[in-house]
Swiss-Prot record:
Its cofactor is pyridoxal 5'-phosphate. It catalyses: L-seryl-tRNA(Sec) + selenophosphate + H(+) = L-selenocysteinyl-tRNA(Sec) + phosphate. Keywords: Cytoplasm, Protein biosynthesis, Pyridoxal phosphate, Selenium, Transferase. InterPro entries: PyrdxlP-dep_Trfase, PyrdxlP-dep_Trfase_major, SelA-like, SelA_trans. The keyword Zinc does not apply. Converts seryl-tRNA(Sec) to selenocysteinyl-tRNA(Sec) required for selenoprotein biosynthesis. The gene is selA. Pathway: Aminoacyl-tRNA biosynthesis; selenocysteinyl-tRNA(Sec) biosynthesis; selenocysteinyl-tRNA(Sec) from L-seryl-tRNA(Sec) (bacterial route): step 1/1. This is L-seryl-tRNA(Sec) selenium transferase. Belongs to the SelA family. One of its GO terms (biological process) is conversion of seryl-tRNAsec to selenocys-tRNAsec. Its EC number is 2.9.1.1. The modification N6-(pyridoxal phosphate)lysine is found at residue 292.
Length: 462
């Protein structure tokens, strides 16, 4: 039986003969032959191991080959629909760019640019000059530098200013960010020497003062943006640390994390320290993210005193950590939105979604509910109140009131429906709880409605 099945396996040339010319030209003969060999060998191995009792036909092998090559051509990084209500979803790409920032990236990608060319002098220029001016205008800093992420920014600052020197940090601020990246490890890699002061829940100004030695290179303050310590607590403000630092002639570095440029508490969100407030308190160097709360491209932005920034720019690590033209293009336009606060709120998707009016979200929920009326034979839809979150390790206490679309079905349980939506050609990421699938309308975009309808329709008709 086994020998008969092995003899029945189709020959590669026979299978090639039934492909149309377009498919052969599009994929190339060598690629198709390689895929067919793998498919036939897999079938042969399964026959020998008595895992199957059939040999593929030419047509079956052809179909498998087409499917495999089509799958290989699919993008690994693809569009997904965020129905979770987590605005800055770390796993779904964090912040979305504005329309104008997206266009700027496309232009930088599809044409030559003055990335490192001084158009006035007709000679080599600096990529950092393209964006330093706008950062200074918005923050009031003397100088600025952009690298590829905030962890890189803080490491570069410490290595440039505090190599082989002691850096004093409160134990309550030795944070861990995503992917197990911890401030102590970043400091160790920068060759700065960590000096911990205070306790996890309480640190006093005298703790900082008592830790000062001849080897002290800086005070480091780290904003705990992704957690809160409550109860019997005490921390030292940046302003108080700066007063002590000025008296002792020690620089102050602050990592404020998410990069808030606007006081969002006026829009009902949790109060977070802004970059401007940090600089005004006397901090010498501030680092923050270019995406997350700022709403731009992933980057680490360093602002502060010119004498320190100039020294950081000369560090050999700066070139290793430099940003590309796409990041600069996206970040420049995003920052220019901030020249007008109203424009920033309306055009930067992250800010727009976080400050979205509850009535607007309800309107969205009603619109989606109405759009899905034709699918009532497959599902039961209802609208419920709920809560969204900011995400991205920002504002851990902020809960944003929202409206959710609840989806129930007698044909498919919530676990399988969530999986089907997640595995759809344009994946739809949802919430599952209380025995149903939920879509949070806060993070649903205008182009998402049709995709949601089509996905639910196809799943219902299976």
């Amino acid at each position: 039986m086994t020998k008969e099945l092995l003899r029945a396996l189709p020959k590669i040339d026979e299978i090639l003969g039934i492909f149309n010319e377009d498919f052969l030209n599009e994929n190339g003969r060598e690629t198709i032959v390689s895929a067919l060999r793998d498919i036939i060998n897999e079938n042969r191995k399964a026959i020998l191991n008595e895992e199957v009792d059939y040999a593929l036909t030419k047509e079956e092998a052809k179909s498998k080959c087409e499917h495999r090559l089509l799958k290989k051509r699919e993008r690994n990084l693809k569009r997904v629909i965020n129905g979770t209500g987590v605005v800055i979803h770390t796993n779904l790409g964090r912040s979305l760019l504005s329309k104008e920032a997206t266009e700027a990236v496309a232009l930088a990608a599809s044409s030559y640019s003055n990335l490192e060319y001084d158009l006035e002098k007709g000679e080599r220029g600096s990529r950092y000059s393209l964006i330093e001016g706008i950062i200074k205008d918005i923050t009031g800093a003397e100088a600025a530098l952009v690298v590829n992420n905030n962890a890189a920014a803080i490491m570069l600052v410490l290595n440039s200013l505090c190599e082989n020197k002691e850096v004093i940090v409160s134990r309550g601020e030795l944070v861990e960010i995503g992917g197990s990246f911890r401030i102590p490890e970043v400091m160790n890699f920068s060759r700065a020497k960590l000096v911990e002061v205070g306790t996890t829940n309480r640190t006093h100004l005298y703790d900082y003062e008592d830790a000062i030695t001849e080897e002290t290179g800086a005070f480091l303050k780290v904003h705990s943006s992704n957690f809160k310590i409550v109860g019997f607590t005490k921390s030292v403000s940046a302003n108080d640390i700066c007063n002590l630092a000025k008296e002792k002639g020690i620089p102050v570095i602050e990592d404020i994390g998410s990069g808030v440029l606007i006081d969002l508490s006026k829009y009902g969100l949790e109060k977070e320290p802004t970059v401007i407030e940090s600089l005004e308190s006397g901090v010498d160097i501030v680092t923050f993210s270019g995406d997350k709360m700022l709403g731009g491209a992933q980057a680490g932005i360093i602002v502060g005193k010119k004498k320190f920034i100039d020294k950081i720019k000369k560090n050999q690590l700066t070139r290793a950590l430099r940003v590309d033209k796409f990041t600069l293009a996206a970040l420049e336009i995003t920052l220019k939105h901030y020249l007008n606060e109203k424009e920033a709120i309306e055009k930067i998707p992250t800010l727009y979604m976080m400050t979205l009016d509850l009535n607007e979200i309800k309107e969205r929920a009603n619109r989606l509910y109405k759009n899905l009326e034709g699918l009532n034979k497959f599902y039961k839809f209802s609208i419920e109140e709920g809560e969204s979150t900011v995400g991205g390790g920002s504002m851990p206490d902020s809960k944003l009131s929202t409206y959710l679309l609840r989806i129930d079905s007698d044909r498919i349980n919530e676990v399988n429906l969530e999986r089907e939506l997640r595995e759809y050609k344009i994946p739809i990421i949802t919430r599952v709880y209380k025995g149903a699938v939920y879509i949070d309308l806060r993070t649903i975009l205008e182009d998402d409605y049709e995709v949601i309808f089509n996905a639910l329709k196809e799943i219902g008709e299976k």
